Amino acid sequence: MNRLASLALLLSFTGCVGSAPPPIPLKPVRFLLINDVYIADTTEGGRGGLARVATIRKRLADQGPVVFVLAGDALSPSVLSKYYRGRQMVEAFNAAKLDYATFGNHEFDLELDTLVARIAESRFKWVSSNCTRAGGSPIPKVVPWDTVRVSGHKVGLFGLTLEGSYPPEVRCIDPDSAARRVVDVLSTEGADLIVGLTHQTAQADRDLLAREPRIDLILGGHEHEALDSTVSGRHIVKADANAESAQFVTLWGGKGSWRQAVGLVPINAGLPRDTAVARVVAEWQDSLRRKLGPVRTVGSTTIPLDPATSVSRRSESLLGNLVTDAVRTETGADVALINSGTLRLEKVIPSGPITNHDLEELFPFGDQTRVVTFPLTGARLRRVLEHGVSAGVLGTGGFLQVSGLSFTFDPARPSGNRLVGDVRRGGRAIAPGDSIRVAFGVYPACRGGDGYQLPEASAACAQQASAPRAVDLLMRYISGSLGGRIETPKNSRVVQAGHTNPG
């Protein structure tokens, strides 16, 4: 980072608000970025918190203009969003004085009408250059681009979201095509600085900068880990998820000759909380506690339960085994499948007592994690499993945790042919013509989530509103079948050829 910008940044965040930073040549354009913020409160260990980010924003604003942006993923998923559908996040962002947001893929977890309601409640602007209603009309109050004067410079902003399996009422077109069009518009509008607010992979961001030299800066999200990368001197920056850090970017110069300085700002207990934002966060947390009811112990676990996606999205996991065992046992199905993206928790559940609140946090998607039961032939079940292991090769949420069967797969083999040998149930191979009763979550089984297509589930899906919640099945299983004590579930269900399962 440039030495002068570094010193200004240090003064901003160490309490020296009254001290003027040393002058920076020309008037700078400054951004404060957060991304993938699913909870407004602090995370485990006391890190993060939008109230602390608001303090940083205020200190920066006291020194000069700063544009505060969110690069997607905030309205879902979380246990609060399961019940309040993102209202708590919008209210916190409003109090924190957010300026701009773009869509992350998880904004589309909400029904479109619900998302439109959240946008209407926002006192900040939503910008998306590639996501619209299915017919191509704009999502209400969402702009494809915007310009804003910052320190005398005309700054153009646009928003991009990665393509994905979204609800049918939403369409997100190819981000690169959308970017080319919107950059043409911003150039014609006379923008001095063009900034992309993106929610896609870092590699997609790099490719975009390499193809489009008129984009000066990308403020991104999606990976959950801080990043500062450059392409021809132009930065791609991302912060850590859940506001455990923010990125502070300073640019000075002029059109075609911008200099850039980037600083990662840890959000920790050393930063005071903004009073107004802290009050909003506390009110929503109190509301959630009342909704969930008294904390009660469901049982105890002799092993830590780790929901880390680095494990569960590529291999069998102990937590996945526990959940699928619960679903299979409590529904009476032959086989239970859970897409790994269902299991979300921002902490490890340690060995010891486990409460109803712990388990509610594990399933933040609400009705999407209801479970339906339906028949599949052995041949169709194998195709479903093939789809799941292909998701595992990519490390996505479509990788399946399973109960009631076992199989081996080889990620080096071609997609659709990665299962090695038989799929086995109860010690014998499942034949193509066998009829298997399968319990599966509503999101993949009924809504096509993660690319699953299961017409066999249509009759069960017609009753999905009354289907049991996975969290209720799990609580019943722990307190009933397990006698309140969780021990290591049987593993070696999903075996990767040549590897030992991490568990």
Predicted regions and their residues:
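Bacterial N-terminal signal peptides
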Residues: 5-15
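Acidic, metal/ion-coordinating pockets
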Residues: 16-283, 287, 314-326, 336, ...
